[in-house]
Amino acid sequence: HVSKAAANQHLWCGAHLVEALYLVCGERGFFYTPNKVGIVEQCCHSPCSLYDLENYCN
């Protein structure tokens, strides 16, 4: 069972983005390079869900 919150679209920027990645990825960790095109464009400039964030987990 997946909560509705995980599917909600949000703008994730800066520290909020990193916190959300920690939450979603847990011990797997994640690949985060703020200068690289990708997660910031997908999740800060336009809304994305926690499902989208999970694509950036290791």
From Swiss-Prot:
Supply the PANTHER family for this chain.
INSULIN, INSULIN/INSULIN GROWTH FACTOR
MF terms from GO for this chain are: hormone activity
Gene Ontology CC entries for this record: extracellular space
Organism of derivation = Huso dauricus
Keyword annotations of the record: Carbohydrate metabolism, Disulfide bond, Glucose metabolism, Hormone, Secreted
GO terms in the biological process aspect are: glucose metabolic process
Known SUPFAM superfamilies for this protein? Insulin-like
What the entry lists under InterPro entries is as follows: Insulin, Insulin-like, Insulin-like_sf, Insulin_CS, Insulin_family
Q: What is stated as this protein's family in its record?
A: Belongs to the insulin family.
Q: Where in the cell is it found?
A: Secreted
Entry's SMART domains? IlGF
Query: What protein name does the entry list?
Result: Insulin-1
Per the record, the domain of life is Eukaryota
Summarizing the function annotation, the protein's role is: Insulin decreases blood glucose concentration. It increases cell permeability to monosaccharides, amino acids and fatty acids. It accelerates glycolysis, the pentose phosphate cycle, and glycogen synthesis in liver.
Provide the primary localization. Answer: secreted
Could you describe the subunit structure of this protein? Heterodimer of a B chain and an A chain linked by two disulfide bonds.
User: Which pairs of Cys residues are joined through disulfide bonds in the record?
Assistant: 13-44, 25-57, 43-48
